[in-house]
Design a protein with these regions (language model features):
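Glycine-rich nucleotide phosphate-binding loop and flanking beta-alpha elements
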Residues: 50, 138-140, 165
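A glycine-rich beta-strand to alpha-helix segment
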Residues: 149-167
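Short connector loops at helix/strand junctions that flank enzyme active sites
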Residues: 9, 19-21, 35-39, 152-154
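N-terminal positively charged helical leader segments and presequences
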Residues: 1-31
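Short amphipathic alpha-helix with an adjacent loop that forms part of the alpha/beta core around
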Residues: 119-124, 142-150
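RNA substrate-binding interface of SAM-dependent RNA methyltransferases
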Residues: 27-131
Length: 167
């Protein structure tokens, strides 16, 4: 069985092979059922140092559909366009490796670094959006929202940088 990274599995047999190539015959195509029933979008505030690499790795291993790096006012890390492009390329490589390691049916994308305002605009298209807040009182409403998430819904989760989000 071979996965294509886009959520499909193919049951194949090897028809022939050479030193650097194999010819396979597809016997069956089926949807990979290993993915979460909801698409989880992680809007991650840029953390200090190389912590984003570990965040991308673990998020992908846990089933996140897409990681969107967010440059916030309180973030210690400030990336210019050139640095941001290189970082995103590196994070995408980490996502590919983590997806393979975890046996994911898809390769989650790492989006371009965006501003908090751009992230909020993007999140408007999602079914459910959660922004954990360290000064929030009680968890009942959050638990209720999470309990009501249904298969097929898209869920955005915002996680701030070390300095938190701006009030």
């Amino acid at each position: 069985t071979i996965g294509d990274g886009d959520g499909w599995l193919y049951v194949c047999v090897v028809e022939s092979y050479e030193e650097d190539m194999a010819v396979l015959k597809i016997l069956e195509k089926k949807k990979d059922e290993s993915e979460l029933p909801s698409k989880i979008y992680l809007f991650q505030g840029l953390p200090k140092q190389d912590k984003m690499e570990l965040i991308v790795q673990k998020a992908v291993e846990l089933g996140v559909y897409q990681v969107i790096p967010v440059a916030t006012k309180r973030a210690v890390v400030k990336l210019d366009a050139k640095k941001a492009k290189k970082k995103v390329e590196r994070w995408q490589q980490i996502a590919v490796s983590a997806a393979k390691q975890a046996g994911r049916g898809i390769i989650p994308a790492v989006g371009e670094v965006c501003t908090y305002a751009q992230a909020l605009k993007c999140a408007e298209e999602l079914d459910v959006v959660l922004i954990p807040y360290e000064l929030a009182e009680g968890m009942e409403e959050t638990k209720q929202i999470i309990a009501e998430i249904r298969p097929g819904q898209s869920v955005g989760i915002f996680i701030g940088p070390e300095g938190g989000f701006d009030e």
